[in-house]
Curated annotation (Swiss-Prot):
Record region (A): 1-341
Name of the gene encoding the protein in the UniProt record: htpG
Cellular localisation: Cytoplasm
Protein name per the record: Chaperone protein HtpG
Chain residue ranges for the region called B: 342-562
Organism this protein belongs to: Cupriavidus taiwanensis (strain DSM 17343 / BCRC 17206 / CCUG 44338 / CIP 107171 / LMG 19424 / R1) (Ralstonia taiwanensis (strain LMG 19424))
Entries under SUPFAM superfamilies matching the protein: ATPase domain of HSP90 chaperone/DNA topoisomerase II/histidine kinase, HSP90 C-terminal domain, Ribosomal protein S5 domain 2-like
InterPro entries on file: HATPase_C_sf (IPR036890), Heat_shock_protein_90_CS (IPR019805), HSP90_C (IPR037196), Hsp90_fam (IPR001404), Hsp90_N (IPR020575), Ribosomal_Su5_D2-typ_SF (IPR020568)
Amino acid sequence: MTAPHETMSFQAEVKQLLHLMIHSLYSNKEIFLRELVSNASDATDKLRFEAIANPSLLENDADLAIRIEADAKARTLKITDNGIGMSRDEAIRNLGTIARSGTKEFFQQLSGDQQKDAALIGQFGVGFYSAFIVADKVTVETRRAGLGAEEAVRWESTGDGEFTVDAIARAERGTTITLHLREGEDDFLSAWRLKSIIQKYSDHISLPIRMPKEVWDAEASTYKRTDEWESVNQASALWTRAKSDITDEQYTAFYQHIAHDNEAPLAWTHNRVEGRSEYTQLLYIPARAPFDLWDRNHKAGLKLYVKRVFIMDDAEQLLPGYLRWVKGVVDSADLPLNVSRELLQESRDVKAIREGCTKRVLSMLETLADSEDEAERAKYATFWQQFGQALKEGVGEDQANQERVAKLLRFASTHNDTAEQNVALAAYVGRMKEGQDKIYYVTADTWSAAKNSPHLEVFRKKGIEVLLLTDRVDEWMLSYLREFDGKELVSVARGDLDLGKLADEAEKAEQEKAEADWKDVIERARAVLAGKAKDVRVTLRLTESASCLVSDEGDMSGYLQRLLKQAGQKAPDAQPILELNPEHALVKKLRDLPEGEAFSDRLQVLFDQALLAEGGMLEDPAAYVQRVNKLLA
């Protein structure tokens, strides 16, 4: 039974999106053709894939192509593909709603910069709506492969918040999108203009894009259209061509197509691998992190082809999780055409591809990081700013390549008076003082908190460099990265901190004397802070601050405890050790105070100040304020 004519309303987010397209992206009008051609290409990829299991879907028409035709009299532009097509329900769902959950994020990402916003359209899978930038009415006629000719559908909208759906007859499988151009958009009726846009954005599309052939009419001094169709793009899969035949511009255009990104990539690698597994890889390092890099539902992974037949997007099994930001294509000669995601998990060939792709990406990063060319090193700095935290995950996730990943890590450090993470572990080791056999670091919520940590005072005094770690992933990473180049990584907030040869004999003697002189005060302090501090002791690691908190050997740091609690996870209740600076005026007064409220209040203030200095939260801020006020009175 033929479905009736229906008028339906767009989803609210689509209305908002249409308004954006029409009113905010007018200076990037030509992107509409890029997006519609990309969608048409995807439709043919889907048909190829479904036809593997059901060849009848090809309907005796295996010559897959995209046709673009302008009609100057009617002022229309048609984009036709003979791909998978859509059923009535699919047309309503795909063209009337935004299915994905990222709608809110899409609008939050909009910056007002038209070029950047235009790139987001493709990233969010809403490229179809860009047609309304140049058209005041859009008509879509489509029939899904496998359905009868009478089961085709016409979808139409003027972009005003509603669309109509009608049943029609259509002999051809696939989709035709007709754009009824707005006044002033006649530029897009020019064959030359359309060809230039196609060659700019879509030359790499692996199926032919055809337009009516035009020949020069000398009498009329103009080009005239013929009944023939000609291909206006290369129409071959870029990765199958020889590297020497591909320009940087073509590599960049292909990246922009698969990544839906207007920016050029930082680097790429293109290789044909032969051996146990035979495959071609074309991998890119983007210049900017996607908005949802840290979203659990983020779709990551490479495009997978088998013998040039598209199999799936987002084949996350081809790269480890810490490289989820890599874009590109893998074309395997060994995998079966009916490969499933489940089969990918178990395949030995996929394991070999994964290992090979991982090594290639790490090699690209090493080339940028170690380059003598300042521009290349600047690219690595850009990469690190965008993806450094993700790369740190590799220290724990990829034991086989841990050493290579560790060499690529960058940190802020007391060597530079800047929050920029630009210090490599190898550079730190190269600057170590004579007698130093450890790499020292401090963790904190912010660079300022790390730089001003009381734990750094003795290191500043001795001129010892300390790494300043402020990323949430750092504590987790350090649980796997115990040493580098034979040097142990040690937190300056450890209670059992041993400077080894960096501490002279006089300092050791002074420490022993202080412990003896303050024995009585320390015993009283331990009694006051019982249940709050694991221990109280004097220290010479402080030169300016009155007190600091340190963690006992084997205990979780206060910083990591806070991170776990913020993430809603249970953290072990490890009490810190309070260390007091015996040379500080606030601490010296403890010796003159008898047991009682005044002694207890001053000691509690010293504990709370140390907790605040390391970024901790007070259990009772009001009590702290009262104690401080007493001291100030």
